């Protein structure tokens, strides 16, 4: 743990260099809205170094923080850039929807050899749910989770949207459907 000034570009660049040297830094953004001031370090450097080095250099880094859609925190604190990051080659994006997801996905992200962006919705910070106690509990990155089985319609959601999709899956106004969430 190193205290840094509030300069997303500086601490992101420092962490990318540390990751290239074998450390596994976790960078915390106060809000993901500020990732744009560290654009070059995240989207050009961290995401591309493995490819630019022909696979010789890994960048095992985690960028995490609140991506706050729907929280009424104002324009400069409410960006949800997960779609942008997910479409950047070399970056992985995770958006936990439960406390167990947060624990298991974060542990997997820290162990991953590529950059991972953890985008958390603060609406979920006070969510109470069971969390597995075993030390080796992880959730593999890149795998989806089905929270309701169905065979007529699928709702694909992430983060807090999982919780708002479940009641919607029981209400279809025109046809009776069996919905997967």
Where are these regions (language model features)?
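Conserved small/polar residues in nucleotide/adenosyl-binding loops
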Residues: 1-4, 171-177
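Conserved thiamine diphosphate
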Residues: 7-10, 16-156, 160-164
